[in-house]
C-alpha cells in the first residue's frame, strides 16, 4: 500500500435487507486529501462514509488504516471524527461546553481543555461566542460549532456527511470556501459526502462519483467535469447534451448525419458511440449545410447567461451563451473539436 494512503477500502461489499448497496468497492484515501463522495441518493456514498467511521462493518472485504485491518474496530477506537447534517449539538450546553464535551469525557485537565477549545474556536472563526446558547446561533454558526467539536480532538480524518444541506444557498457557498481553507490549515484528511455537484467541484482535491454501489469515476474536479468516462458521469456532473454518434475514423465523428472533428481516437470505424457536449461549449451561428441545423424553441435569461434550447432532428439541445435568440430562429450547432467528448456505448450501461 502506498505510504501516503491513510485509509483503504479493499473489495468491500455491504448489503442491507438483502439489497446490495456497495459492490466490491476499492478506494484509497490519501493523507491531507479533501476527497468527496458524490452521487445520487442510494448510491452508497453515506454507507462508505459510515464504514470508514466504524458505524458499519463490511460483509465482504476489509478496511485498512495505514495497512492495519480496522474492519471490526469500533468508532471510538479510530482516529476519526464525524460531522453530520444534523449537527447533534447539546441544546443545554453553551458553545464552549459543546466543543469541550469530548475532551471532558477523556478527563483532560481544565487548562489543556481550555487551550484546545480556544484553538478550535479560532480555527472556525467563533472567538467571542463561547458563552452563547446553541439556540442563539445561526445555522452557519451551529455548523461551525459542530466542526469545532470534531476537530478539537485532533483527528487524522474528518468525515462530513452532507453538513451544508440545511443551509441556504448563499451561506452554503460561503461555507464551501471556509471548509476548504480549514482543511488546508489543519492539514488533515477530509472525506466529504454530498449529492451537490457544485460542492464537490468547488472544494475537492479528488471527486469519487458513485452510482448503484459502484465507483463510476475517480479524479480531480477538472478531470471529472471535462473528461467524464461514461454517460452517467457526464449527465450527473452538470448539464450535458448526450447524443448518439458514429465514429467514421480517428478524430472524426458523425452526429445527425453531419461530420464533426474531435480529438478522441481508438474507436472502430463506424462504431456507434455516445457523444457528450457541454451546453457552454456550443456556439450558435447562421444555418450551414455542413452543420446540424435547428430551430430555437426557447431562450431564457439566467443571470450570467442565456439558456437556449434548439430542436434538431427530434433532439433538443441545451446551450448556454451570452447572446439572446428568438424562438423560431434558425441556427446551426457549432463545436470545437476538443469540446466533443466520445464514449463507448457500453460505458453508458455501467451508470444505469
Swiss-Prot record:
SUPFAM superfamilies: MOP-like, P-loop containing nucleoside triphosphate hydrolases
Enzyme class name: translocase
GO molecular function: ABC-type putrescine transporter activity; ATP binding; ATP hydrolysis activity
Catalysed reactions, semicolon-separated: ATP + H2O + polyamine-[polyamine-binding protein]Side 1 = ADP + phosphate + polyamineSide 2 + [polyamine-binding protein]Side 1
Protein EC: 7.6.2.11
Membrane topology, record value: Peripheral membrane protein
Top-level taxon of origin: Bacteria
InterPro entries, alphabetized: AAA+_ATPase, ABC_SmlMolc_Importer, ABC_transporter-like_ATP-bd, ABC_transporter-like_CS, Mo/tungstate-bd_C_term_dom, P-loop_NTPase, PotA-like, PotA_ATP-bd
Pfam family, one: TOBE_2
Positions bound to ATP: 39-46
GO cellular component terms listed in the entry, alphabetical order: ATP-binding cassette (ABC) transporter complex
Keyword Signal attached: no
Keywords: ATP-binding, Cell membrane, Membrane, Nucleotide-binding, Translocase, Transport
Compartments where found: Cell membrane
Keyword Translocase: yes
Ranges of residues in domain ABC transporter: 7-237
Family: Belongs to the ABC transporter superfamily. Spermidine/putrescine importer (TC 3.A.1.11.1) family.
Subunit structure and binding partners: The complex is composed of two ATP-binding proteins (PotA), two transmembrane proteins (PotB and PotC) and a solute-binding protein (PotD).
Role description: Part of the ABC transporter complex PotABCD involved in spermidine/putrescine import. Responsible for energy coupling to the transport system.
Descriptive protein name: Spermidine/putrescine import ATP-binding protein PotA
Amino acid at each position: 500500500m502506498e505510504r501516503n494512503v491513510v485509509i483503504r477500502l479493499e473489495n468491500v461489499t455491504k448489503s442491507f435487507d438483502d439489497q446490495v448497496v456497495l459492490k466490491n468497492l476499492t478506494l484509497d484515501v490519501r493523507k491531507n486529501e479533501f476527497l468527496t463522495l458524490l452521487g445520487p441518493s442510494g448510491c452508497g456514498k453515506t454507507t462508505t462514509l459510515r464504514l470508514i467511521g466504524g458505524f458499519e462493518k463490511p460483509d465482504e472485504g476489509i478496511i485498512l488504516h495505514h495497512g492495519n485491518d480496522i474492519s471490526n474496530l469500533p468508532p471510538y477506537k479510530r482516529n476519526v471524527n464525524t460531522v453530520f447534517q444534523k449537527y447533534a449539538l447539546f441544546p443545554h450546553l453553551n458553545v464552549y461546553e459543546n466543543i469541550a464535551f469530548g475532551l471532558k469525557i477523556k478527563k483532560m485537565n481544565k487548562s489543556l481543555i481550555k487551550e484546545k477549545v480556544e484553538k478550535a474556536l479560532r480555527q472556525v472563526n467563533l472567538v467571542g461566542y463561547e458563552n452563547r446558547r446553541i439556540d442563539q446561533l445561526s445555522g452557519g454558526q451551529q455548523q461551525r460549532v459542530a466542526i469545532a467539536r470534531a476537530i478539537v480532538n485532533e483527528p487524522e480524518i474528518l468525515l462530513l456527511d452532507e453538513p451544508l444541506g440545511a443551509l441556504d444557498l448563499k451561506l452554503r457557498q460561503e461555507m464551501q470556501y471556509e471548509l476548504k481553507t480549514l482543511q488546508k490549515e489543519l492539514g488533515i484528511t477530509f472525506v466529504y459526502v454530498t449529492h451537490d455537484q457544485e460542492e464537490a467541484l468547488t472544494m475537492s482535491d479528488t471527486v469519487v462519483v458513485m452510482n448503484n454501489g459502484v465507483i463510476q469515476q475517480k479524479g480531480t474536479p477538472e478531470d471529472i467535469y471535462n473528461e467524464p468516462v461514461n454517460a452517467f458521469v457526464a449527465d450527473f456532473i452538470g448539464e450535458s447534451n448526450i447524443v448518439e454518434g458514429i465514429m467514421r475514423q480517428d478524430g472524426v465523428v458523425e452526429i445527425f448525419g453531419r461530420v464533426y472533428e474531435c480529438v478522441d481516437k481508438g474507436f472502430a470505424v463506424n462504431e456507434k458511440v455516445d457523444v457528450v457536449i457541454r451546453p457552454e461549449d456550443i456556439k450558435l451561428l447562421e444555418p450551414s449545410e455542413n452543420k446540424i441545423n435547428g430551430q430555437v424553441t426557447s431562450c431564457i435569461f439566467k443571470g450570467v447567461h442565456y439558456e437556449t434550447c434548439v430542436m434538431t432532428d427530434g433532439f433538443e439541445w441545451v446551450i448556454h451563451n451570452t447572446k439572446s435568440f428568438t424562438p423560431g430562429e434558425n441556427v446551426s450547432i457549432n463545436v470545437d473539436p476538443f469540446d466533443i467528448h466520445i464514449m463507448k456505448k457500453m460505458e453508458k450501461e455501467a451508470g444505469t
